[in-house]
Amino acid sequence: MRLFKQLERWKIRRQINQSIIDVIFRLRDRLAHYWQADVNTPQVDFMLLHIACSLGRIERGGCVSSLYSEMLEEMQSAVIFPQVLAIHQDLLKLMPFSIPEAEQTYFLANIHSLVLEQKQLKPLK
């Protein structure tokens, strides 16, 4: 499994720790079992690796700059954005600590790509 191997490499380099790996696999399970995502795709691996990097960075006191506002506005105006936001808010509940808004913009971008790629995701009610 590509995802697990990369997470283990980052753990050895002390970029992340075991608690972050545990969170990533909880997120993966939530995507698979609740949102009905196919979690065996490069897109999901990319998203989860990005989240792992972000959590490690936050634990070390760092934070990225926000996604370009034009890109964020384009995502927010998309017809799929309510579903993107619902998934985002659901996954945030599984995070071990507060995620800065700037980091969240990239989470939204990754989830946006996921929703575009996977039409079988659980629909909003």
Curated annotation (Swiss-Prot):
GO terms for biological process: regulation of DNA-templated transcription. SUPFAM superfamilies: PTS-regulatory domain, PRD (SSF63520). InterPro entries: PRD, PRD_sf. Residues 15-121 form the PRD domain. It holds the Pfam family PRD. This is Uncharacterized protein HI_0487. It comes from Haemophilus influenzae (strain ATCC 51907 / DSM 11121 / KW20 / Rd).
